[in-house]
Amino acid sequence: MSFVEICLVLATIGLLLFKWSTGTFKAFEGRNLYFEKPYPFLGNMAASALQKASFQKQISEFYNRTRHHKLVGLFNLRTPMIQINDPQLIKKICVKDFDHFPNHQTLNIPNERLVNDMLNVMRDQHWRNMRSVLTPVFTSAKMRNMFTLMNESFAQCLEHLKSSQPIAAGENAFELDMKVLCNKLSNDVIATTAFGLKVNSFDDPENEFHTIGKTLAFSRGLPFLKFMMCLLAPKVFNFFKLTIFDSTNVEYFVRLVVDAMQYREKHNITRPDMIQLLMEAKKESKDNWTDDEIVAQCFIFFFAAFENNSNLICTTAYELLRNLDIQERLYEEVKETQEALKGAPLTYDAAQEMTYMDMVISESLRKWTLSAAADRLCAKDYTLTDDEGTKLFEFKAGDNINIPICGLHWDERFFPQPQRFDPERFSERRKKDLIPYTYLPFGVGPRSCIGNRYAVMQAKGMLYNLMLNYKIEASPRTTRDMWESARGFNIIPTTGFWMQLVSRK
């Protein structure tokens, strides 16, 4: 083949790829919907897809440019989505007319074991059945028992911190990457509360559960690239029978749960963890659950809890070191709680009574939302109208919907001075002024996160123990502008969550 022929072949392939990459970009033509010009392959998500900005920043900036439109077209890579910018319309779609938008965006990975059986991926009646069974698992009574397991992990974390190397001889302070610490904590909490396994990743960071668990975080590395390919070219991804996660690692968690269930049934053992609660739920359910369906509900902890719970603690600690007056007020509440407990470990009920802690965490979830957006899928044709009955838009079955959570959270019309960390927004006096459907830290409607209590419980427990023993200060390596330095799906600075802990004793 001559050089000219090779060039022609390459040019043809390039042209076909370009045509394919832009093949969905006419989706909004003739639908009376404003949209910004998308880039080939990357749509309106170029900066986050290329790791130039966080997904939160990308969505927030897009929202700011288009918020004067109640609805706007958005291209998430090649996928056309209809973004809802108006809180009242969000209520209509996600709550009032939920039956038209009951599912999340389709994630079609037939070769991926467990993923399709997770609650947040399930659809229609299958999801409804599983949701009704799992909802009692996350009640206060069940969380109260599970909190005792978390306390063991908090204690292990504090022991590890006590052995940390001081900055200099005679100093009572040391520097650490809070993200590394909290990832280990999240790992151990998930191990004990979801999988019935006791591990100590502080003393043994190379333990099997931690080593394999880290491979399931798809917000970075090879899993991130595979996930992007799955979204960008699902047919190609499935044609080659690719998977996001290594099948050997997935099998490890399957065996862990199945073996634990068999052992407990054989020896009549009970433990207040997720496996036990699922075993009890299975007995009461009319559905014949498969082992994979049970394992998948434990497996989801790595998707919904591992990174998110760790990030919630990190972002809150970051704001506390930047706002020492808020940190001092929180410390006073923590001391009062400790005195009321008379030296006993923190309990679930005592954690619930810490109102200022609630305010601090709520504001952290507002400013540094764990999820940049929520999504829905239109199940049947739907005419969207305003309160006066005026037609706004015609949705078609198969339309993907985007709810810009971080955009709403940073909108000064709803949260004045949104860049300011102000827990008072969530005080008893002021939280009644919040506009409904503008604060959505765990999603909205029946499809909202079922494990929100679990996430807040872990954050409260860790922050209580941290504040009780240490003052959090900035270190030379502390990120100055997290909004600009964060990358990927989560708010994680590229340099890490470095800070300094100063012992209070």
Curated annotation (Swiss-Prot):
One of its GO terms (molecular function) is heme binding. InterPro entries: Cyt_P450, Cyt_P450_CS, Cyt_P450_E_grp-IV, Cyt_P450_sf, Insect_CytP450_Detox. Heme binds at residue 449. Disulfide bonds: none annotated. Coiled coil: none annotated. Its EC number is 1.14.-.-. Belongs to the cytochrome P450 family. This is Cytochrome P450 9b1. The gene is Cyp9b1.
